[in-house]
């Protein structure tokens, strides 16, 4: 069995294009090779196959036996820890997913609405609305406060103030493919270089998290509290065991980083799209003034289609995959190229146009709209993120009527 055709260029050239111009790189590959192709990055023992046909994606995600692709642990484990939900597989992953799911769905999730509104309105009060300012950093501030309040129950205090700064540093070093590439390249320099400095900052963040865990364990009202850390401390696996401090640290770091940066970026992209499409912005404002949220939901769905924050969500095949004319052997690393699926003209007419109305009548197909991945590894906080985006967008657009921008030029 042979893999789909491989992208042009050396492994180093491919990874540099991926790091600096990922969408242009994927679009060129689609035009040259079609719905599936392979890439080869330095340091990985085999190519990775990228797919974009929904039928192939469904076949991949429906099989629970598939594992994590190569490279995920290399990038994430030093930061999130080996027990992180994002790095667990099989029964270990499902057990942790069951314990961590409740706060991010249903009534428990909706109970955070007032807190979210308070946080975003306090943030708006600090904005210099008489001049231009970057929105992404302001969305990071909002979503970080929300996740801190959800995880710890409070967001004040000197320890959490220091933790904010530490998390910002960790994100700066790990959030983009470019920074991940630099980190991978400099880890070999023991005792010096950017990676050694980053490790010191990460240890300082760990000290703060362990101090919060220790303080929480001493709380006499632990069973009455509704914050996520208290819930995780009280949770028990099927064998009756509780999470250790090390595992709590890993899950907290996962929630604090993954639980706010992706939402902040999605919000920033949504504002970017709205401010480049005045008619859509005007229609959204009018619908919110009328107390109707259908267009708001459609706007978020369309934004996540055009600007998915996570580009890949793959698997290592545990068994042979047959789909979309492909036959791939067990052991192959396969990932949906999310943006390519989202911009397929056969699925979405005018695929590069921002048209929220395309989602007013019908929800997207499960395997043609995958900003949160899919299958048993679909993002734990997907519902929470969309809920948070609705509240933040509604509050800002209701209060701020002078939002504008100077340019809509794009570079992908």
Task: List each model region and its residues.
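N-terminal membrane-proximal hinge/A-helix region immediately C-terminal to the signal-anchor transmembrane segment
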Residues: 1-95, 110, 114-122, 157-158, ...
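Cytochrome P450 heme-thiolate monooxygenase catalytic core
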Residues: 1-4, 68-77, 92, 108-265
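Conserved cytochrome P450 K-helix E-x-x-R motif and the immediately C-terminal K′/meander segment
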Residues: 15-34, 207, 211, 290-324, ...
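Cytochrome P450 heme-thiolate "Cys pocket" and heme-binding signature region
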Residues: 95, 102, 312, 324, ...
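Cytochrome P450 catalytic-core helices
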Residues: 143, 260-287, 382-400
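Cytochrome P450 fold signature focused on the C-terminal beta-domain
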Residues: 216, 220-226, 283-293, 306-326, ...
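Conserved cytochrome P450 K-helix/beta-meander segment immediately N-terminal to the heme-binding cysteine loop
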Residues: 336-363
């Amino acid at each position: 069995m042979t893999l789909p055709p491989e992208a042009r260029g050396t492994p180093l050239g491919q990874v540099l294009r991926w790091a600096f111009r990922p969408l242009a790189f994927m679009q060129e590959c689609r035009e040259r090779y079609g719905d599936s192709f392979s890439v080869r990055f330095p340091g990985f023992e085999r190519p990775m196959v990228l797919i974009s046909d929904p039928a192939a994606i469904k076949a991949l995600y429906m099989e629970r036996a598939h594992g994590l692709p190569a490279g995920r642990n290399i990038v994430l484990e030093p930061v999130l820890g080996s027990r992180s939900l994002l790095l667990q597989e099989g029964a270990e992953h499902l057990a942790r997913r069951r314990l961590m799911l409740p706060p991010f769905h249903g009534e428990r999730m909706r109970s955070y609405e007032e807190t979210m509104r308070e946080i975003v309105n306090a943030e708006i009060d600090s904005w210099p609305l008489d001049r231009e300012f970057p929105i992404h950093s302001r969305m990071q501030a909002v979503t970080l406060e929300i996740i801190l309040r959800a995880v710890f129950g409070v967001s004040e205090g000197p320890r959490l103030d220091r933790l904010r700064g530490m998390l910002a540093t960790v994100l700066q070093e790990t959030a983009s493919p470019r920074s991940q590439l630099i980190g991978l390249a400099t880890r070999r320099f023991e005792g010096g270089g950017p990676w050694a400095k980053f490790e010191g900052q990460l240890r300082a963040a760990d000290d703060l998290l362990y101090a919060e865990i220790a303080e929480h364990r001493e709380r006499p009202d632990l069973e009455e509290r509704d914050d996520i850390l208290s819930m995780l401390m009280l949770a028990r696996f099927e064998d009756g065991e509780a999470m250790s401090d090390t595992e709590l640290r890993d899950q907290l770091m996962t929630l604090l980083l993954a639980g706010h940066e992706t939402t902040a970026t999605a919000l920033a992209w949504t504002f970017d799209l709205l401010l480049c499409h005045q008619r859509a912005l005007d229609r959204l404002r009018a619908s919110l003034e009328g107390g109707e949220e259908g267009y708001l939901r459609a706007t978020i769905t369309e934004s996540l289609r055009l600007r998915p924050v996570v580009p890949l969500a793959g698997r290592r095949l545990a068994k042979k995959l047959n789909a979309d004319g492909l036959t791939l052997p067990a052991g192959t690393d396969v990932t949906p190229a999310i943006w390519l699926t989202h911009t397929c003209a056969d699925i979405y007419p005018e695929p590069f146009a921002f048209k929220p109305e395309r989602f007013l009548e019908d929800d997207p197909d499960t395997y043609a709209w995958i900003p949160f991945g899919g299958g048993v590894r679909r993002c734990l906080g997907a519902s929470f993120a969309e809920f948070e985006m609705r509240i933040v967008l509604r509050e800002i657009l209701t209060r701020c009527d002078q939002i504008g921008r100077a340019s809509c030029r794009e570079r992908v």
